[in-house]
Amino acid sequence: MQTTARLSVAEVFALLISVASMRAAGNLPFAGLADAGLAKIEKALPSDKVRDLRRFLDCLYVGKLAPQVDISDMGAMAPDLLPAFEMAFLQRLHLRFEYRDVKGVVTNRDVEPQAMLILPPLWYLVAWDPARNDFRHFRMDRISAPAYVEGETFHRRHVPFEDGVSSIRKLPR
């Protein structure tokens, strides 16, 4: 007996970014099977969910972490971060959260989420910060109490990335 699983866009996106991060790290032994399975999942989604998924994929970038980056303080991501990011990104709503910087100082942020950057093993929220009038990269394991803000929407901005960072759509399969 075969059953059909109902997956949300966030669940499919989580699968895709997991595969992408493993591919970027260079250790995905069954990449072909993973891609085939994900393609089947995408085909089973309703057209509005495929549109949401593609918009999500357009914001996903991967690269390699510089060897000198200290990851000794890396922690777990807040479980409510991805759902809050999904809603904020798809609906172009501000994302509000507490952010702990490298020195341990916690600040409240209200940003416009533009992209997600995976530099395995670290993940970053790339956002326009209206208070600073510039892009900011937030390590996702340092974000707590995330919530999208109902109301005013924002416009997408072109996010400049350095060489060595690629859109997930441009990664070799």
Positions of predicted regions on the chain:
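Bulky hydrophobic/aromatic content
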Residues: 9-81
